[in-house]
Each structure stands twice: as structure tokens, then as C-alpha cells.
From Swiss-Prot:
Species annotation: Klebsiella pneumoniae subsp. pneumoniae (strain ATCC 700721 / MGH 78578)
Active-site residues annotated for this sequence: 95 (schiff-base intermediate with dxp)
Zinc as UniProt keyword: no
SUPFAM superfamilies: ThiG-like
Protein name: Thiazole synthase
Name of a matching Pfam family: ThiG
InterPro entries associated with the record: Aldolase_TIM, Thiazole_synthase_ThiG, ThiG
Gene Ontology MF term list: thiazole synthase activity
Domain of life the protein comes from: Bacteria
Binding site for 1-deoxy-D-xylulose 5-phosphate: 156, 182-183, 204-205
One annotated GO biological process: thiamine diphosphate biosynthetic process
Subcellular location per the Swiss-Prot or TrEMBL entry: Cytoplasm
Catalytic activity of the protein: [ThiS sulfur-carrier protein]-C-terminal-Gly-aminoethanethioate + 2-iminoacetate + 1-deoxy-D-xylulose 5-phosphate = [ThiS sulfur-carrier protein]-C-terminal Gly-Gly + 2-[(2R,5Z)-2-carboxy-4-methylthiazol-5(2H)-ylidene]ethyl phosphate + 2 H2O + H(+)
Major location category of this protein: cytoplasm
Length: 256
């Protein structure tokens, strides 16, 4: 079980809602993934309409919604979007995203920390998307974020855990859940993140753009389970030398 703030999740896989060919495919994939927490970009939905094409099926699916501030370029814009989301959706949970450069979509560390501090004071459960910077993640934790969401690689790149060395440090020093977000391209990347000690991963593009999003969602679900089980099983220590799995000479001596 995974606990973040006031909620407990059985699934360690969080999913996004962007890039799907149709809302029906999106909902089917989310169900296949087993995900219980789904991110939702505020700029993509009509908050005045509960029958919005994206919002309505998510509400019907019974998943917890995690509105995000994607599109915000400053702390002020992110705080404004967060307040709108809380009023419209009735949730104090928020994925904080601030990326001023539309080409690279890398999170702004200064604005993210500033917004996180303000939002925590206002009672939000803040899950910030951030760079794989151990110092920044610790600062976000210290100002009261309920979890940290460092990137594995740039959003939508499918490159995998390019920031593995930094993620390992973040995981080792964290006292809040670590959710690896962005760049995860195939199920094996997700399994690796869980094996490393991450508490969860968030996947969107890899599922949404697959030839069969529902099958890919199911594959990610299995990979998450495998990665978590492998970590709990206690992997053997790595060695720089070969280690024989059976005696090399004993059987020859027995025959002599």
C-alpha cells in the first residue's frame, strides 16, 4: 500500500490523460492500468461542465483526480490555476507544474519552490513535478510537499531513467514518497524505478501513443507489480567479479 497525505493507494502506478485518441480509449487504458490516481490538465477541460468529454468519464470511473497546473509559467499563474481547480473539482490535491519553456518543458526550480510554499500554506496537498535535483527535492519536502515527482527524462521523450544517479540520491534521502514522473517510455523503465526504491511512477505518453494503449497500460501494471515485488524480495548484491553458482573443481576431485 502507498500512502500520500490523507489517501492510501493499492496501485503504485499513476496515469495521465493527455494524447489519447479518444476519451473512451483513455478510460479503458486507465482501468487496465489499475491506476487509482489520474492527473488532469486544467487547461484541457471545461470546469463549468461536469459532462465535459474528459472530466465526465473520469468521474464515472471512480478514480481520484490530481489536477495539474501544466501551462503555468510562473508561481503566480500556478497558484491561480490551483485555486480554480480546488473550487471547481472540490479537491485540495494538486500536481504542481511550472515550465516556462514550451520546447523543453523542463520545470522551473525557483518558481516551483515559491509556488509550493504558498500552496502548502493554503492547505493544498502539493505533489511538485521537478528536476532530478536532490537539493531541490529536499527543499520541497521541507516546505511541506506531500511527495516529490522528479523527472526521469524530459516529458514525452520516452527516454527512460536518464537521471538514474540523481534519482537514487533523492530516494535515499527522502522522507516523503518519491514518484518518478516524465520520460518513462516502456514498462521495464517503470519496473526499474520501483526496483530502485521509488514509491510510484506516473506514466502518460508511453501508454497513450502506443499502438494498443489498453494492452500497454496492462503491461505497465504488471511491470510495476514485478518491480515492487523484486525490491521486496531483496535482490542480491552487485559484484565486480564473477561468482560461481556451483563448485568448479569438487566434482573432478570426487572422480579422481
Amino acid at each position: 500500500m502507498l500512502r500520500i497525505a490523507d489517501k492510501t493507494f493499492e496501485s503504485h502506478l499513476f496515469t495521465g490523460t493527455g494524447k489519447f485518441a479518444a476519451p473512451k480509449v483513455m478510460v479503458e487504458a486507465i482501468r487496465a492500468s489499475g491506476s487509482q490516481l489520474v492527473t488532469l490538465a486544467m487547461k484541457r477541460v471545461d470546469l463549468r461542465q461536469r459532462n465535459d468529454a474528459i472530466l465526465a468519464p473520469l468521474l464515472a470511473a471512480g478514480v481520484s483526480l490530481l489536477p495539474n497546473t501544466s501551462g503555468a509559467k510562473t508561481a503566480e499563474e500556478a497558484v491561480f490555476a490551483a485555486r480554480l481547480a480546488r473550487e471547481a473539482l472540490g479537491t485540495h490535491w494538486l500536481k504542481l507544474e511550472i515550465h516556462p519553456d514550451a520546447r523543453w518543458l523542463l520545470p522551473d526550480p525557483i518558481e516551483t519552490l515559491k509556488a509550493a510554499e504558498l500552496l502548502v500554506r493554503e492547505g493544498f496537498v502539493v505533489l511538485p513535478y521537478c528536476g532530478a535535483d536532490p537539493v531541490l527535492c529536499k527543499r520541497l519536502e521541507e516546505v511541506g510537499c506531500a511527495a516529490v515527482m522528479p523527472l526521469g527524462a524530459p516529458i514525452g521523450s520516452n527516454q527512460g531513467l536518464e537521471t538514474k544517479a540523481m534519482l537514487e540520491i533523492i530516494i535515499e534521502q527522502a522522507t516523503v514518497p518519491v514518484v518518478v514522473d516524465a520520460g518513462i517510455g516502456v514498462p521495464s523503465h517503470a519496473a526499474q524505478a520501483l526496483e530502485m526504491g521509488a514509491d510510484a511512477v506516473l506514466v502518460n505518453t508511453a501508454i497513450a501513443v502506443a499502438d494498443d494503449p489498453v494492452a500497454m497500460a496492462r503491461a505497465f501494471r504488471m511491470a510495476i507489480d514485478a518491480g515492487l515485488l523484486a525490491r521486496q524480495a531483496g535482490p542480491g548484491a552487485r559484484s565486480t567479479q564473477a561468482q560461481a553458482t556451483s563448485p568448479l573443481t569438487g566434482f573432478l576431485e570426487a572422480l579422481a
